[in-house]
């Protein structure tokens, strides 16, 4: 990804797990991101989409698992995750929507 066309092309989805949910109290959020994106692009995309200030971005490449099917073996897609820490004093990101 040479240039950012749309920030929503970089941030694909939030990661919903026990571990990522526990980190929400510390203003740390986890997202599935485009595999070719870098930390700078992820930071700019988060700041544009959610209007927050990002302190740091850590990334992790997750290798796709080999899975057995009826006809042999297949492979799940490899993914990239970004662990985003918000700056102190920044408003929290509302991932799940406020109750009506």
From Swiss-Prot:
GO terms for molecular function: rRNA binding; structural constituent of ribosome. Gene3D superfamilies: 3.30.70.330. Keywords: Ribonucleoprotein, Ribosomal protein, RNA-binding, rRNA-binding. One of its GO terms (biological process) is translation. The keyword Ribonucleoprotein applies. It holds the Pfam family Ribosomal_L23. InterPro entries: Nucleotide-bd_a/b_plait_sf, Ribosomal_uL23-like, Ribosomal_uL23/eL15/eS24_sf, Ribosomal_uL23_CS. The keyword Mitochondrion does not apply. Part of the 50S ribosomal subunit. Contacts protein L29, and trigger factor when it is bound to the ribosome. PANTHER family: 60S RIBOSOMAL PROTEIN L23A. One of the early assembly proteins it binds 23S rRNA. One of the proteins that surrounds the polypeptide exit tunnel on the outside of the ribosome. Forms the main docking site for trigger factor binding to the ribosome. Belongs to the universal ribosomal protein uL23 family. This is Large ribosomal subunit protein uL23. It comes from Mycobacterium marinum (strain ATCC BAA-535 / M).
